[in-house]
Swiss-Prot record:
Coiled coil: none
Protein name as annotated: Ubiquinone/menaquinone biosynthesis C-methyltransferase UbiE
Keyword Methyltransferase (UniProt): yes
Organism: Bartonella tribocorum (strain CIP 105476 / IBS 506)
Pathway, per record: Quinol/quinone metabolism; menaquinone biosynthesis; menaquinol from 1,4-dihydroxy-2-naphthoate: step 2/2; Cofactor biosynthesis; ubiquinone biosynthesis
Protein role: Methyltransferase required for the conversion of demethylmenaquinol (DMKH2) to menaquinol (MKH2) and the conversion of 2-polyprenyl-6-methoxy-1,4-benzoquinol (DDMQH2) to 2-polyprenyl-3-methyl-6-methoxy-1,4-benzoquinol (DMQH2).
UniProt xrefs under PANTHER family: 2-METHOXY-6-POLYPRENYL-1,4-BENZOQUINOL METHYLASE, MITOCHONDRIAL (PTHR43591:SF24), METHYLTRANSFERASE (PTHR43591)
Classification via InterPro entries: SAM-dependent_MTases_sf (IPR029063), UbiE/COQ5_MeTrFase (IPR004033), UbiE/COQ5_MeTrFase_CS (IPR023576)
GO BP, sorted A to Z: aerobic respiration; menaquinone biosynthetic process; methylation
Length: 260
């Protein structure tokens, strides 16, 4: 099942969506990187804008559903987690017993995360790795859990990233993904569209001097597969007991799968 609408471009390469714009697959990753280099210092503010502050509640729900144990040998891989926001929450929930590896393709995001880890005294419990979610630099069966929050929609080949998640998880390991989703309440959908397409780019220009980056982030949400379609993709990658929970009228959704 395709991760997004793809077609062959004029030069023979596969075309992908960069928001609502068609681009060659060789261009998409560099364009996404440019967006996140631009917003790295204001990433939490960006999520506050995109979610009206609700991302903090959703992330707490994600960690609560994961329920990390207070065990020193328990290891979690947080992908596209450069600023450390999810990893810090997981470590707190494990009473600082677990070990987290934060992976991101964007060095600017990782720099923010490293600074925050040092500031919060968590650096000994976290490894920061700059790498691609489609080609994880880890051996098979290395982690007890794989988390990704608001990142998988920016991966050019989502199906490949899901296969890599399955590969690096231990048997019995857990996959959890938090992502903006398909709003299912008609009245809420209209309100959120008005906020997203009209207010957010203007606020992005005001806060980060980059309205185009925020416009891409809004458009990328609309291009992401609907909940049932994404759940099917997770199953296709090999996961069992796949389920999802809608959050706040399905503005976001939590997807779960197990490696059995």
């Amino acid at each position: 099942m395709a991760t997004e609408t793809e077609r062959v471009g004029a030069k023979g390469g596969m075309e992908h969506s960069f928001g609502f714009t068609r681009v060659d697959e060789t261009q998409k990753q560099s364009m996404v990187d440019s967006v996140f280099h631009s917003v790295a210092e204001n990433y939490d503010k960006m999520n506050d804008i995109l979610s009206l502050g609700l991302h903090r509640v959703w992330k707490n729900s994600m960690v609560a559903w994961l329920s990390p144990p207070a065990l020193s040998h328990w290891k979690v891989l947080d992908v596209a987690g450069g600023t450390g926001d999810i990893a810090f929450r997981i470590l707190k929930a494990s009473r600082q017993k677990a070990h987290a590896t934060v992976l991101d393709i964007n060095g600017s995001m990782l720099s923010v995360g490293k600074q925050r880890a040092q500031k919060n005294g968590l650096a000994p419990l976290i490894d920061f790795v700059e790498a691609n979610a489609e080609h994880l630099p880890f051996e098979d069966q290395s982690f007890d859990a794989y988390t990704i929050a608001f990142g998988i929609r920016n991966v050019p080949h989502i199906d490949q990233a899901l296969r890599e998640a399955f590969r690096v998880l231990k048997p019995g390991g857990r996959f959890l993904c938090l992502e903006f989703s398909n709003v299912e309440m008609p009245w809420l959908d209209k309100i959120y569209d008005l906020w997203s397409f009209h207010a957010i780019p203007k606020l992005g220009q005001f806060i980060a001097n980059d309205g185009d980056a925020y416009r891409y982030l809004v458009e990328s949400i609309r291009k992401f597969p609907k909940q049932n379609d994404f759940a099917h993709m997770i199953k296709q990658a090999g996961f069992s007991r796949v389920s999802y929970r809608n959050l706040t009228g399905a503005i976001a959704a939590l997807h779960s799968g197990w490696k059995i």
